[in-house]
Amino acid sequence: MATGTDQVVGLGLVAVSLIIFTYYTAWVILLPFIDSQHVIHKYFLPRAYAVAIPLAAGLLLLLFVGLFISYVMLKTKRVTKKAQ
């Protein structure tokens, strides 16, 4: 069973994810249909970042997954050599 702290952290992560999803959805899907002179545009980054930010996040994710897999494989190889 999860402790109270785990539940609070989980709820916080869900809340942050929901806020990011709502912001990004409004930015990418709704904003192009609103007049460019409308005041709401000042609350959003330029459209070029709508592609650049997720691309950079995806590349960082792939980098960390690759590093983790490499680390685990090298560690397993060392343990196997010591056992022999």
Curated annotation (Swiss-Prot):
Q: TM segments? A: 11-31, 49-69
Q: Which family does it belong to?
A: Belongs to the DPM2 family.
Function (record text) = Regulates the biosynthesis of dolichol phosphate-mannose. Regulatory subunit of the dolichol-phosphate mannose (DPM) synthase complex; essential for the ER localization and stable expression of DPM1. Part of the glycosylphosphatidylinositol-N-acetylglucosaminyltransferase (GPI-GnT) complex that catalyzes the transfer of N-acetylglucosamine from UDP-N-acetylglucosamine to phosphatidylinositol and participates in the first step of GPI biosynthesis. May act by regulating the GPI-GNT complex.
Its pathway is:
Protein modification; protein glycosylation
Q: How does it assemble?
A: Component of the dolichol-phosphate mannose (DPM) synthase complex composed of DPM1, DPM2 and DPM3; in the complex interacts directly with DPM3. Component of the glycosylphosphatidylinositol-N-acetylglucosaminyltransferase (GPI-GnT) complex composed at least by PIGA, PIGC, PIGH, PIGP, PIGQ, PIGY and DPM2. Interacts with PIGA, PIGC and PIGQ.
Q: Could you tell me where this protein is found in the cell? A: Endoplasmic reticulum membrane
In its UniProt entry, what is this protein called? Answer: Dolichol phosphate-mannose biosynthesis regulatory protein
State any GO BP term from the record. protein glycosylation
Associated disorder, per UniProt?
A: Congenital disorder of glycosylation 1U: A form of congenital disorder of glycosylation, a multisystem disorder caused by a defect in glycoprotein biosynthesis and characterized by under-glycosylated serum glycoproteins. Congenital disorders of glycosylation result in a wide variety of clinical features, such as defects in the nervous system development, psychomotor retardation, dysmorphic features, hypotonia, coagulation disorders, and immunodeficiency.
A single Gene Ontology CC term: dolichol-phosphate-mannose synthase complex
